[in-house]
Every structure is written in C-alpha cells, then in structure tokens.
Amino acid sequence: MRAAAYSKAMRVLHVASEVFPFSRSGGLGDVLGALPAVQARLEQETEVTVLSPWYASLDGEPQELWRGELGGQETWLGELRQGGVRFLFLGLSAFQRPGLYHPDDVERFCAFGRAALPALDATGVTPDVLHGHDWQAGLVVAHAHLRGLRTVFSVHNLQYQGRWNLHEAAGWTGLPDWAFGPEGVEFFGDLNLMKAGLSFADHVTTVSPTYAQEITTPQYGEGLDGLLTRLTHQGRLSGILNGLDQDRWNPRTDPDIAAYGDPAGKAGAGADLRQEFGLDDAPVLAAVSRLADQKGMDLLLTALPELVRDWNVVVLGGGDPLLTSAFTGWAHHPRVAFAQGMNEPLAHRIYAGADAFAMPSRFEPCGLSQLIAMRYGTLPVVRETGGLVDTVPHEVGFRFAEATAQALTQASREAHAAYQDPAQWQARAALAMSLDFSWDGPAHKYLALYESLLGTAHPQT
C-alpha cells in the first residue's frame, strides 16, 4: 500500500559510483540506469536526480554547471538529462584517470563524499530525500544525515565495505570526532564507509527480502550482522527486489538475436548459438558471470565432468585467473565453450540460445542473470540464496540448497530430465517469460518509503 502522498513535489537524489550508460562495471550501474527513470515516469511531479563521479572515461559529455574550490582542491559539476532524469557528475582530480575503480578508492570516495553536498549547494540542488547506494555513497549519507536530510541507504553487496585504517583515514572524512566511535563509522580499528551508510541512514534497504534476512546472520553479515539485526528490530531494514530493464532485455525486439515472443521461437536462437560455438545437438546449460568465489563458478568447474554427459556447457565471464585458466583448458572439450571477458551482444545470444542457466552462487544479494534468463525463456538452475529464492519459482527453475558441485549436478540432472518432456519444459519456459520483473513495482515501493520518511522524525543513530 502506498503511503499518504507527500504534500509537495518530492526532490529525490540518488548517489552512486556508477550509472548506466555513462559509467558501468556491473549490476549497480544497471540499477541506477533504470530505477530513477522509472520513478520519474511513475511520479511526474517528483524531481529525480542522480549524482555520480565525473570519470575521465565517462561515456558522455556533461555540460559544466559550476567550477570552484572545495577543501583545497578544484571541483566541478556537470549535467546531462535523459529519460526525465537529471544526471549530475562531480569532478575531482582523483577521478581523472582511466577506469572506474582503483586501490585508493577509500580515499577517492571520501573526497567525493566530502565535496558532494557543498557542490550541490553551489548549484542550488537541495533534495528532500537522499538515496545512497553501496559503500561509495556511505559518507554522503552520513553528511546528509548531519544536515537533517532524510536518507535511504541501499546495500547491493555487503561484502565490499570500503575499509581503511581509521587513524590514517579519519582526516579524509570531514566528520565530527564523535562519529568515529563503534556506533558510528569505526569497525575493528578501521574506517568503514559501508557502516557509515548503515549507521546514519534513516532507513536501509537491500536488493531482495531474503538477502535482508540473511545479512542479519553471522554467515552472511560480513561482521555487521549485529548492527543489521538492530536495524531490523527498529524497523529500519527491509528488502526490495531489483527489477529488470525490460526494454534492454526483450526477446521480441532484441537486435542481437533472431527475435521471438514465445518458447517455441527459441529454437532458432539455440541453433545459432550451437553453430557459433561448434556444439552438438545436446541442450545448452549456460553461465554468464564473474569468475569468482561468490558466484560459485568453482562449483560449476568441478561439476563439468558430470554436466557434459547431458549438456553442452557455455560460459562467458572473466575474473579469477585460476578459474579463467581452468575454463580455458576445458574449452577444448567438444561440449564446452568458454568466452573470456564480458561481451554484451554475446551475452544476449547466450541468454536467448541456452536452454538452462546455472547460478550456483554462494550468496546472491538479488541477481540479474536469472531475471534475464527467464525473460528469454531459459530456465535457471540456482542455489537457494538471496534473491534467487525470491525470484525463481519451483514451477519454473531448479533449485538446490548446498553450495557443492554434487548438489549442482543433481539439480542439473533434474533439469535435464524435465527437458526430455517437451510439454513440461515448454510450460515452464512460458511461465518464466510471463513473470513480471519490471521496475514499476520496486520503484513504487521506494517512492512510498521516501514519502513515509518525510512524514516521520529522524531515528536515533
């Protein structure tokens, strides 16, 4: 249910380290490229702005609005408008190098966090609600709270926290001395910018209801489970599922594939994928993923000798050098194809041409790949964790509980058995393609959260 409408047009400011299509390395950028635009469309009186760094590699040419000196360094702010959203880019010398992320990111995003609100002041931007995303925005959330602004902080992945020795880093933050205690930004002798966001936000969200529960436990809480449990008891932590950009990922209009609108139409995409990689007529089990421990890609690697009995296996990804080398070695097998790195047109062809999609994640805050796979009628084989629990119904996909190669193999066998029954497989695929994972629902929930905060007093930090 929507909260009572705020009495005047809301001004919402999202703050994040990346935003598609201007800067992107992963799912965070995808969220910031989609959610604000949907919010602006759903509530046309709401002013939606996104603030992110002005990287040297930024894909776009913002119009400079302001240039001055803040904290002893030259600072500038630029603007682009797209899809009803105002995108602001904060320029600092620390971000004038190739790429997005670097080993000194804690210091860089402290500079960003200190300069953000003063730079906005200089251009007359005063939000009603500031919505920070992940640790890179944690310090901005803390400074916004100290100004009395209403704040939301979204955890997209708790594993990455933005930590640095507190004695060295305290001077980078611009925070008052009292903020450096255990109830503030201190974490085992370190500055922790994720904890800054958690501690100072009026409300904290994660990107799925199950992940919101998981991170209150020692297994998934990354040392912050005590704080997150307290936030839960205070009613200040909730999970809101991410959505999917259904224009960007649409099998009916996708320019990278032979378009189709129902499961029967996948046959052409499947034939194209097998031909591209020189595979036989066995069904295709695919993975498009970072090659990382979190994603369970070592489990997929260990399971390969069993999987290739039933499946062609196609993997697209990069990351861990050892896993990359191992998958490269397996690519000589006639039923295994491996493409290193990330290639979006190829990813589209894989999502469309595969029959099943493996996500053996050890943890998965929300997950985007399973949403894309189902949109294309490709059935997920997933471990029961985080957003995979919330998004993959038993009637569609194949789920397993233990993070082992054996459990993945068994679930894949169940998927293969279902594939042998075309009527069952087509019914599952049709249901998958009918599921609504658009951003409209999540966008409404965030807008309702903002409205509720504007009608309440600040909680105690």
Kindly give the residue locations of the regions a language model identified.
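Catalytic cores of nucleotide-sugar-dependent glycosyltransferases that transfer UDP/GDP/TDP-activated
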Residues: R2-T461
